């Protein structure tokens, strides 16, 4: 039994000896080269000079260094300790310093959960102020953080479980000689002494420059019960932490002494301290090169700036003449449009039309705009164009795209209008990626565009001819209401006058046959609107060459469906049959009526609006009426004259009365081969397209000037076209333009006049 008790005593004494060897009451680091008792973490390293570097000049770092052995505090008496260390905070040139250095007393050396920057490498947002987090820290902080109640960017504080200091003061020391506190710049890069003393329940903190003795008055003195803060006082670790953020610096510990007895701290020997490294700018030698280099650089910079200035000036250059001053209120600067469209970038590109590219833009006032860039080769007609653009700006109608103004550069015009968020109508008709418009939406668009054209023809101060009515020029606003836009070809003339233009411009399929000989008129707009109505209803383009012959031309195809009493078969299949049949038939018939090749048989836009709103019944006509369902394409390059090979006969009203047509005119044609082509410079195109095979002799019924007069029937065999007669016909039309302009005095449509002249030439040849 005694032997067994002796063994227990021996083992216990060995265990106590082991614990005593692992715990210490004091230590000193005159150099940190002996790393046996050091615990280093994160960016903390020991330099060859013996300096302990906690952080280097890198962003968002933190470093920890602890004495590896726990401190042996008394388990019964009051807790006390003293520590004295020398540190240096060296900022990187041109940067603010890091977040500072902290002396730490903690039951653990593990701070992997901590955050850098303002949390100093020992705290984080979740542990901030937690009573279960047992940490005492003395901070030398060089960043002002109002969230943590910092007083400035150069202070010393006492932290308990939180980065919010329980005691804080600007870095300074008490001078007995001056009897006042002298400030210290923590980021001076010079070594600074720090003393931390705790006895009883009072914690004192002092700082001073390296050459100054410990001040007689501490900088901070605050009561703290460390017995409550550290219930397990037998296992506490002392060390340092440092952190950086976007503010960076090198943070060093040069020397460190610690003891649980205040009087047993080892004295500092300044002569043995390692030198603190300071980053310095490279030494510059004064030489001729150094003197000339700034001069050369200055000249180069001036040259570059001058080049950029002239390039920028040329980039935003505009053309402005004296006559444009009256239009200044409607003119945009190119600079503002360039910035609004982000330099006409691809991201703002909306599309490309026949007259230019369109871009989306945002003005500084928040207004969205569409900018069309139109090229022109000279100044001829520009003044008239600008004047008409400004006049268009005065047009006010809910179904017109508002035109805000213009900008003019060399060989370029820019038209500024309101941006329509839902794009153009043709995208919703032909693009499967776009949502399908219902019939009710399409009818609203048709009615709106009809109202807009009526306004342009009769409601404005001058008659406005749009000259390019088609689905791609119809824009849809946020509510999918139709807005007529793209006035790039519009022309003005006084009410009761004629449009001062003879140029045949427009889009193939929408151009009235008389456009090339008579020029633009309200009737040519009506024709294009008729094609547009059929386009919206049928969901197809006016001419689609890839289809079968009978379906190739929309106008003819719709008329053929009407002849077969199957008009609804021509409707857009994407509607899925969801429409009002009466409305669809009315719109289709009205489209055929408006696209009649006989101009006098077309309604006015005022009548069209009344028809669409059911305020006026449609006139009595059929698919066999003269000019209904006949497609007469117009070739606008005027390089040849084309007439179909056919024979014609003239008769009086007695023949027309037996015809199913209710119009006094009947024009039948054949699907015979097209007439031969003769090349003549600046000649006009007259194209007659046959409808279906028939005998060589066909008939044209003309109105009689006198109901009592008798007209003999003139018949002939098929006569082949002859180049000479075509040339003569062209020469007659060019030499006697009054035939086109005064044809109405003869009571005959101009097409009949042209065909009659041709056949009279043929008969004369025979």
UniProtKB/Swiss-Prot annotation:
Q: Which residues form the Protein kinase domain?
A: 344-616
Stretches the record annotates as Legume-lectin like: 24-259
User: What kind of membrane protein is this, topologically?
Assistant: Single-pass type I membrane protein
| Matching CDD domains | lectin_legume_LecRK_Arcelin_ConA, STKc_IRAK
| Source species, domain of life | Eukaryota
Task: Read off the SMART domains from this record.
Answer: S_TKc (SM00220)
EC top class named in words: transferase
State which tissues express it.
Expressed in leaf petioles.
Q: Give the signal sequence positions.
A: 1-21
The positions flagged as glycosylation sites are 56, 124, 128, 181, 204, 225, 232
- Name the predominant localization: membrane
Query: What GO biological process terms are annotated to this protein in UniProt?
Result: cellular response to ATP; defense response; defense response to oomycetes; extracellular ATP signaling; focal adhesion assembly; regulation of jasmonic acid mediated signaling pathway; response to wounding
| Phenotypic effect of disruption | No visible phenotype under normal growth conditions, but mutant plants (e.g. lecrk-I.9-1 and lecrk-I.9-2) are defective in extracellular ATP-induced calcium response and susceptible to an avirulent isolate of the oomycetes Phytophthora brassicae and Phytophthora capsici. Impaired increase of cytoplasmic calcium concentration in response to extracellular ATP.
What changing residue 147 to N does, per the record, is:
In dorn1-6; impaired increase of cytoplasmic calcium concentration in response to extracellular ATP
EC number(s) given by UniProt: 2.7.11.1
Annotated effect of mutating residue 467 to Q? In dorn1-9; impaired increase of cytoplasmic calcium concentration in response to extracellular ATP
Give Gene Ontology CC terms.
plasma membrane
Where does the chain cross the membrane?
A: 290-310
Q: What keywords would UniProt list here?
A: ATP-binding, Cell membrane, Glycoprotein, Kinase, Lectin, Membrane, Nucleotide-binding, Plant defense, Receptor, Serine/threonine-protein kinase, Signal, Stress response, Transferase, Transmembrane, Transmembrane helix
Instruction: Sum up the protein's function in the record's words.
Output: Essential receptor for extracellular ATP. Binds ATP with high affinity through its extracellular legume-lectin like region. Is required for ATP-induced intracellular calcium response, mitogen-activated protein kinase 3 (MPK3) and MPK6 activation and ATP-induced gene expression. May play a variety of roles in stress resistance. May be involved in protein-protein interactions with RGD motif-containing proteins as potential ligands. Plays probably a structural and signaling role at the plant cell surfaces.
Q: Which family does it belong to?
A: In the C-terminal section; belongs to the protein kinase superfamily. Ser/Thr protein kinase family.
* Name this protein carries in UniProt: L-type lectin-domain containing receptor kinase I.9
- Species of origin: Arabidopsis thaliana
What taxonomic classification does the UniProt entry list for its organism? Eukaryota, Viridiplantae, Streptophyta, Embryophyta, Tracheophyta
Gene that encodes it: LECRK19
């Amino acid at each position: 039994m005694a032997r067994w008790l002796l063994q227990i005593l021996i083992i216990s004494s060995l265990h106590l000896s082991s614990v005593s060897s692992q715990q210490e009451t004091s230590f000193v680091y005159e150099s940190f080269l002996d790393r046996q008792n050091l615990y280093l973490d994160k960016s903390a390293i020991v330099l060859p000079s013996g300096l302990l570097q906690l952080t280097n000049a890198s962003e968002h770092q933190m470093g920890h260094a602890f004495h590896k052995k726990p401190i042996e505090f008394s388990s019964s008496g009051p807790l006390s300790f003293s520590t004295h260390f020398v540190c240096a905070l060296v900022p990187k040139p041109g940067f603010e310093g890091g977040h500072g250095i902290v002396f730490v007393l903690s039951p653990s050396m593990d701070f992997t959960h901590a955050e850098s920057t303002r949390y100093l490498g020992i705290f984080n947002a979740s542990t901030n102020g937690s009573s279960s987090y047992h940490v005492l820290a003395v901070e030398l902080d060089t960043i002002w953080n109002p969230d943590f109640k910092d007083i400035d960017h150069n202070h010393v504080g006492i932290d308990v479980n939180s980065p919010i200091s329980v005691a804080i003061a600007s870095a300074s020391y008490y001078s007995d000689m001056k009897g006042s506190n002298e400030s210290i710049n923590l980021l001076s890069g010079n070594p600074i002494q720090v003393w931390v003393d705790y006895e009883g329940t009072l914690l004192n903190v002092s700082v001073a420059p390296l050459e100054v003795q410990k001040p007689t008055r501490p900088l901070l003195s605050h009561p703290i019960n460390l017995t409550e803060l550290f219930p397990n006082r037998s296992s506490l670790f002392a060390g340092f932490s440092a952190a950086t953020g976007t503010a960076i610096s090198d943070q060093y510990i040069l020397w460190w002494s610690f003891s649980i007895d205040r009087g047993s701290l080892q004295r500092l020997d300044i002569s043995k301290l390692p030198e603190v490294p300071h980053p310095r700018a490279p030494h510059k030698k004064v030489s001729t090169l150094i003197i000339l280099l700034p001069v050369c650089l200055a000249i180069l910079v001036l040259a570059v700036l001058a080049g950029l200035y002239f390039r920028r000036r040329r980039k935003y250059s505009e053309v402005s003449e004296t006559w444009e001053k009256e239009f200044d209120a409607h003119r945009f600067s190119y600079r503002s449009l360039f910035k609004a469209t982000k330099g006409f970038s691809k991201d703002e590109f909306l599309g490309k039309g026949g007259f230019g590219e369109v871009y989306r833009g945002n003005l500084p006032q928040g207004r969205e705009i569409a900018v069309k860039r139109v090229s022109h080769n000279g100044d001829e007609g520009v003044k008239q164009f600008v004047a008409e653009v400004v006049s268009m700006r005065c047009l006010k109608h809910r179904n017109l795209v508002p035109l805000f103004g213009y900008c003019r550069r060399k060989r370029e015009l820019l038209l500024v209008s309101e941006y329509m968020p839902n794009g153009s109508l043709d995208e919703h008709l032909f693009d499967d990626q776009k949502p399908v418009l219902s019939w009710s939406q399409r009818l609203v668009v048709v009615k709106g565009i009809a109202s807009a054209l009526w306004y342009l023809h009769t409601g404005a101060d001058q008659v406005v001819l749009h000259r390019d009515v088609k689905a791609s020029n119809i824009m849809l606003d946020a509510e999918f209401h139709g807005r007529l836009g793209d006035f790039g070809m519009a022309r003005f003339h006084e009410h009761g006058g004629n449009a001062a233009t003879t140029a045949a411009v427009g889009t193939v399929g929408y151009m009235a046959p008389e456009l090339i000989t008579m020029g633009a008129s309200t009737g040519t707009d009506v024709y294009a609107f008729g094609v547009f109505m059929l386009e919206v209803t049928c969901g197809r383009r006016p001419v689609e060459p890839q289809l079968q012959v009978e379906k190739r031309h929309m106008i003819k195809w719709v008329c053929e469906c009407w002849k077969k009493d199957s008009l609804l078969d021509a409707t857009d299949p994407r509607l899925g049959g969801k429409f009002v049949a009466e409305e669809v038939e009315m719109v289709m018939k009205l489209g055929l009526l408006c696209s009649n090749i006989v101009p006098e048989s077309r309604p006015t836009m005022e009548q069209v609006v009344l028809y669409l709103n059911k305020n006026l019944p449609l006139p009595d006509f059929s698919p066999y009426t003269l000019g209904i369902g006949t497609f007469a394409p117009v070739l606008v390059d005027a390089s040849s004259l084309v007439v179909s090979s056919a024979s014609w006969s003239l008769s009086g009203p007695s023949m027309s009365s037996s015809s199913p047509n209710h119009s006094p005119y009947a024009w039948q044609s054949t699907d015979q081969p097209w007439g031969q082509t003769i090349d003549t410079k600046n000649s006009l195109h007259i194209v007659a397209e046959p409808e279906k095979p028939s005998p060589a002799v066909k008939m044209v019924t003309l109105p009689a000037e006198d109901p009592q007069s008798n007209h003999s029937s003139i018949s002939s065999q098929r006569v082949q076209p002859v180049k000479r007669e075509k040339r003569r016909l062209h020469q007659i039309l060019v030499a006697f333009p009054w035939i086109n302009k005064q044809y109405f005095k003869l009571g005959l449509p101009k097409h009949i006049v042209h065909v009659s002249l041709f056949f009279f030439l043929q008969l004369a040849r025979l």
